Amino acid sequence: MITNIGAKSLLCIVGFSITICFSSIGQYHDYGKITFERKTNLLKRFQDSRMSKMINEDNKIKIDKFELLFNDTSSVFRPIQDISEGRMGWMTTKNHYYQYLGEESQFIILGLFGQNIYIKDSLPQRQWKITESKRNISGYDCRKAIYEKNDSTRIYAWYTPELTPPIGPEGYCGLPGTILGLATEDGGIVYFAKSIQLVAPKNEDLTPDKGKNKVFTLVELKAKIEKDYGNTPWGKRMFDDLFRWL
């Protein structure tokens, strides 16, 4: 059985989950810190001949770590710095996502050529298909959901209603619980929660440092990148990388 869920249905489902919480044994939580491990298959990500000289079976899987800090209204998904990754560091993206559920808004910091790009926009509205498939991730029972981004791209997510905020890695949200697993259909990029701590985040962790930088909307940024780099041979690759999850 597969169930379709949109933004309008989500509040009812989350509300129902929270109601159950008060009659349960206290297993539902709306705050915490989740450490994620991301595995990227570099052979699937880079298929041109130049990159094949740098990537082989021994180093094709690149591992990055992230953390998701959250309470009942706000969250931040951010990379955990690894000073040992050396020259392979540029091969994968490491972005920051701040989400504010009450305001239905998000602030994103994208990394591009060693510089940061700042984006403020509304929370994405995705149509999820919830399936009957289940698995346990880091001690939490999860259910599988599918998002069809376009005709050629499907994203799989595993969420748990035991953590009630509808958030997840890379700004993915909109399910009746927190996403603990996220993957592209071909397995080229996979996120899984490795540890979950029930600790409340600090307010300063949930507030981005905007400085005096220019802030774009997603529509404005896409238009600028297409205009500036759309005619270059590497422009499409950069565009796909930046907006893979958006």
Task: For each feature predicted by the language model, list its residue ranges.
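Bacterial Sec-dependent N-terminal signal peptides
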Residues: M1-I34, R244-L246
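Extended soluble regions of mature proteins
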Residues: Q27-L246
